[in-house]
Regions:
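Internal helical hairpin/lid segments
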Residues: 244-272
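Short coil/turn segments at beta-strand junctions that form active-site/ligand-binding loops
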Residues: 19, 76, 122-125, 252-260
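Core catalytic region of metal-dependent phosphoesterases/phosphodiesterases
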Residues: 1-63, 158-165, 173
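Conserved beta-sheet core of the metallophosphoesterase superfamily
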Residues: 42, 48, 134-212
Length: 277
């Protein structure tokens, strides 16, 4: 997977000389390892933010969470808030009777935005990138590849993303969706299914065009499903005998063979095959 990751960055930046890439760590990533080769990746116009750096006195290095993005003419057009998944200790401590995690995350985004707003020039937009679960976001009930916290202890209010931010691109939730109905705050979702719970999702990416400090066009681009996903049975698990009959009746596929999820219901030990060997 690491070989594919680095090879992709090399190829896509080599084939697109003005392309810049910004990557932030998610909750499943080794943040320090992801950021370790940063000097080499920067030579390929790729910025990675895995950890929240702090000074010796404990102050957050907000400059490290800021990435300047240039247009084809080489002019800075976007100031990017590149914020990785925030763990305990990454965000400011906020006195609150509510959710300390959510309030701390909100405060980090607020302080970072204040710095960028003072720094931005005319016709420059602010873009935010984050990896978190927003309150009200929709996940698949049986999708165990998405980590949720009981009671919503790590759910962040969409109010953390000010209207001063032209577009907010969020990760963590695999299903594409607007956050609280806001057109410019979205989960693009995963470009491919991450589990069989997502076999009915429409996967893709979001293409955003900026001009004059605003996101002037937001368009969803669907990704083709290269390998189909099938579940047998399509509904709830069934006995081994029923499952075997369904498998026998499956049609011969043309092209890529599907990934198959077989759901077998066993309410007691079951011996299906014996061998004299």
């Amino acid at each position: 997977s690491q070989s594919l990751y680095y090879h992709f960055i090399y190829r896509v930046t080599a084939e697109n000389p003005t392309l810049q890439i910004v990557i932030v760590a998610g909750n499943h990533d080794s943040a320090a390892r992801l950021e370790a080769p940063l000097p080499l990746l920067q030579a390929m116009r790729t910025e990675v933010r895995g950890v929240v750096r702090k000074s010796d006195d404990g102050e957050i290095d907000y400059d490290h969470l800021t990435v300047e993005l240039k247009n084809r003419d080489g002019e800075v057009e976007l100031l990017c808030m590149a914020v990785p998944f925030l763990r305990q200790g990454d965000y400011p401590t906020v006195p609150t009777e509510g959710n300390p995690y959510a309030e701390g995350v909100r405060e980090l985004y607020t302080q970072l935005l204040q710095r960028l707003w003072k720094r931005r020039k005319e016709n420059q937009s602010i873009l935010a990138i984050g990896h978190l679960q927003a309150i009200g976001s929709e996940i698949a009930e049986k999708d165990y590849s998405e980590r949720t916290v009981i009671g919503g202890l790590e759910c962040v209010s969409p109010d953390a993303f000010s209207e001063q931010i032209a577009y907010t691109a969020l990760g963590h939730i695999h299903k594409a969706q607007r956050v609280s109905g806001r057109e410019n705050v979205r989960y693009a979702g995963s470009p491919i299914p991450m589990s069989f719970a997502e076999k009915h999702y429409h996967h893709g990416v979001v293409e955003v065009t900026f001009d004059g400090g605003c996101a002037v066009d937001i368009m969803r681009v669907e990704c083709p499903r290269l390998i189909p996903l099938m579940s047998v049975p399509n509904g709830e698990p069934a006995s081994p005998e029923i499952v075997l009959e369904i498998l026998k009746e499956l049609p011969v596929t043309e092209g890529a063979e599907p990934y198959l999820e077989v759901k077998v219901l066993l309410d007691e030990p079951c011996l299906l095959y014996t061998s004299d060997a």
